[in-house]
């Protein structure tokens, strides 16, 4: 069902891509890239369990991961096609129920209406199978882009999103979404971006009423659960001897179902620097503060799906080229979060070493 839905969601976009590619442009310039990675990992929390002071954490486990990626771009006289696809797999030794297969893809077709205005369509899909977080995330949007010069770029988009969470179908939702992205480059090293997105989420279940003693009666309310997801923020980027990035994002999820509302502030930073012996160091970290006005009724697994790996994280990677197309890489990452009121905590560390091939 989901794979069929993915194909159907991309069918209109594929038609537009073909129409644009078959335009009056006599020829097109094509470019592409391939990338593959193989890594050995040590995972301290493969099942992604929450624990407290009285609960023993899961055992450490080894895993082997493979990742393949392909991307391409076609440039015509007044049109451009961009696409990418990734396929990843992870195999554990002890926690074999956490073995995963992840696919993701995105396509974009744009057409210039003049020297500074353009329109286009884009679509994306991600499908994760296996483990405790099996889901599919689909979306298509149309956008209008304004770029009067190399300094300023503004994109406004509108479309629809569908999310399917297999372990708990009550978390499935769909609905329209709109967004805006603006970027201003002060010079070749400094740039500032602002962004905002809003998604109306309609679920197939009834909303939860406020429990007795909190201003309402227990049980379910008539109608369907409806959420509004708002995200807004800004980011600064510096490109020089050291690459730096700093992002602040605010997210508000308001729901007519009791216990599903949350507000989140998140700050993230990343850096990259060249070290001696042709070694590159990449580092990334994030801190989050989340408020739950009604307390928590959200499933911890769903929280991790939304945030990918929890609220707070720190990771680092060292890479050194062995040849023109092969790199040796070593990485470490830690992710953690804490749920208020019940004192449950989530902590996970992953160590890895492997190779990345590029073409």
Model-derived segments and spans:
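Bacterial N-terminal signal peptides
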Residues: 11-21
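Bacterial N-terminal signal peptides that target proteins for export
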Residues: 1-13
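Gram-negative and organellar
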Residues: 27-359
């Amino acid at each position: 069902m989901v794979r069929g839905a993915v194909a159907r969601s991309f069918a209109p976009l594929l038609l537009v891509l073909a129409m644009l590619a078959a335009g009056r442009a006599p020829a097109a310039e094509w470019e592409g890239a391939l990338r593959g990675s193989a890594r050995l990992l040590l995972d301290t929390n493969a099942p992604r369990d929450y624990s407290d002071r009285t609960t023993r954490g899961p055992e450490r486990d080894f895993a082997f991961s493979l990742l393949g990626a392909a991307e391409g771009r076609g440039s015509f006289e007044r049109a451009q096609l961009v696409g990418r696809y990734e396929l990843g797999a992870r195999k554990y030794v002890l926690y074999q129920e956490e073995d995963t297969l992840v696919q993701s893809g995105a396509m974009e077709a744009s057409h210039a209406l003049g020297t500074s205005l353009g329109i286009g369509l884009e679509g994306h899909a991600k499908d994760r199978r296996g483990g405790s977080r099996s889901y599919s995330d689909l979306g298509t949007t149309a956008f209008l882009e304004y770029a009067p010069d190399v300094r300023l770029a503004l994109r406004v988009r509108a479309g629809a999103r569908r999310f399917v969470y297999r372990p708990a179908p009550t978390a499935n939702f769909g609905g329209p979404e709109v967004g805006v992205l603006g970027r201003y480059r002060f010079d070749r090293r400094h740039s500032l971006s602002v962004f905002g997105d809003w998604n109306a989420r309609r679920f197939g279940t009834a909303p939860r009423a406020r429990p007795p003693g909190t201003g309402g009666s227990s049980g379910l309310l008539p109608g369907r659960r409806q959420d509004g997801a708002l995200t807004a923020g800004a980011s600064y980027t510096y490109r020089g001897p050291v690459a730096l990035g700093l992002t602040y994002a605010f997210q508000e999820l308001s729901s007519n179902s009791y216990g599903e509302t949350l507000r989140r502030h998140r700050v993230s930073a990343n850096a990259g620097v060249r070290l001696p012996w042709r070694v590159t160091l990449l580092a990334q970290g994030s801190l989050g503060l989340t408020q739950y006005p009604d307390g928590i009724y959200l499933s911890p697994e769903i929280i991790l799906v939304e945030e990918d790996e929890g609220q707070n994280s720190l990771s680092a990677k060292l890479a050194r080229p062995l040849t023109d197309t092969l790199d040796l890489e070593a990485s470490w990452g830690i992710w953690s979060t804490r749920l208020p009121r019940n004192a449950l905590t989530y902590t996970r560390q992953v160590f890895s070493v492997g190779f990345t091939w590029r073409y």
